[in-house]
Amino acid sequence: MSNNTDLSPVHVIGGGLAGSEAAWQIAQAGVPVVLHEMRPVRGTDAHKTEQLAELVCSNSFRSDDAETNAVGVLHAEMRLAGSLIMACADAHQVPAGGALAVDREGFSQAVTARLEAHPLITIEREEITGLPPTEWGTTIIATGPLTAPSLAEAIAAETDADALAFFDAIAPIIHFDSINMDVCWFQSRYDKVGPGGTGKDYINCPMDKEQYEAFVAALIEGDKTDFKEWEGTPYFDGCLPIEVMAERGPETLRHGPMKPMGLTNAHNPTVKPYAVVQLRQDNALGTLYNMVGFQTKLKYGSQTGIFKMIPGLENAEFARLGGLHRNTYLNSPVLLDNVLRLKSRQTLRFAGQVTGCEGYVESSAIGLLAGRFTAAEKLSQAAVPPPPTTAFGALLGHITGGHIVTDDEPGKRSFQPMNVNFGLFPPVDVPKPEGKRLRGKEKTIAKKRALSARALADCRNWLSLY
């Protein structure tokens, strides 16, 4: 690390996981940083301490398996990149099977101590109530899902009122190769061809009356997750949980998101479905499909059981389960460029959950990328995005443009927060052992190993550029 104290400092707003990682990466590159954190001057209903990188929910960083799990691959890539968050997590690990879980207090204290001790990092405990003044120059905003209202309003004013969401309306997402296409079929309602469409843009899962009634009953009876007190989220009709719609009456769903009109079962064209669940392509690769209109507050265990009642989804593998909770995140594919800068004001860069990633590790990873991109620019170097074959690149690609924009639902947003998963990675050829044809679980594991190996090799090559 060489010190470039003659450089003007980079300002980082937000001392959570992403902001802490971004500040560390910048300082490690020899560029001075001012890290602004509003706690303890102003607290939140979720945070309990004034430590940086406080974990407000679980203490788990999820799977540490870098061979067959996408988040484990992201762990490995972050370690290769000298991540502060991963170093402190490893140092404060607690037993958790194959997962990386941490002593939450020891972890956040360690992050805070490392940042406070760094000679190029200055920590300012103050609330930033608006967008940074132009004299600050390069600034990273990493204020997370609980961004203070005044700053959120300033961001909304700069970007456009519709560009900042305050609720996650998350529907489950399913791996395409786990959908039974002997039961389901491709068709858009009334064979409508939209922009970039073919008239066969949805996967349709048919139900007869008996299946529909059993499904509605299961939704009503399923275990629900209550809103956390600090979320204070009212229901609104444009984003009602699927189980709340079911409670409004037995016919509500089949006249709403499960309406069968305009659809003909390609496998049995003479029989009209009583109800239909539609799945819409979720990423440009076509490896992931989301359940249209199925935002939910059902507990995860209930979701998997109930949604596998849907014909064609009996063996569904979920890349993400549904949810509805308070959040603050940008419509990043529209607003940010491929190195996380605001297109309309390129001295501003965003990082962490405010960009539309989901999870501790993902937020930290985007903070790491934002820090590296910023440091490169300050040192008059090129900010080179990671390849899409890496976990870094797959996640960045989702945030900055890997989702599908649709015009068939006026007023609704197609971009939703996402955890890293193999469905975001470009496909890979799976090597076949001589004389052996891989099937089932064996084939799935081989595919994941191939994706992981390619990701780590490509990540090493990318890091060699810096």
Swiss-Prot record:
It comes from the Bacteria. One of its GO terms (cellular component) is cytosol. This is Methylenetetrahydrofolate--tRNA-(uracil-5-)-methyltransferase TrmFO. NCBIfam families: gid_trmFO, PRK05335.1. Its cofactor is FAD. It catalyses: uridine(54) in tRNA + (6R)-5,10-methylene-5,6,7,8-tetrahydrofolate + NADH + H(+) = 5-methyluridine(54) in tRNA + (6S)-5,6,7,8-tetrahydrofolate + NAD(+); uridine(54) in tRNA + (6R)-5,10-methylene-5,6,7,8-tetrahydrofolate + NADPH + H(+) = 5-methyluridine(54) in tRNA + (6S)-5,6,7,8-tetrahydrofolate + NADP(+). The gene is trmFO. Coiled coil: none annotated. Transmembrane segments: none annotated. Belongs to the MnmG family. TrmFO subfamily. SUPFAM superfamilies: FAD/NAD(P)-binding domain (SSF51905). InterPro entries: FAD/NAD-bd_sf, MnmG-rel, MnmG-rel_CS, MnmG_N, TrmFO. One of its GO terms (biological process) is tRNA methylation. Pfam families: GIDA. Its EC number is 2.1.1.74. Keywords: Cytoplasm, FAD, Flavoprotein, Methyltransferase, NAD, NADP, Transferase, tRNA processing. It is found in: Cytoplasm. Signal peptide: none annotated. Catalyzes the folate-dependent formation of 5-methyl-uridine at position 54 (M-5-U54) in all tRNAs. The keyword Transferase applies. GO terms for molecular function: flavin adenine dinucleotide binding; tRNA (uracil(54)-C5)-methyltransferase activity, 5,10-methylenetetrahydrofolate-dependent. FAD binds at G14, G15, G16, L17, A18, G19.
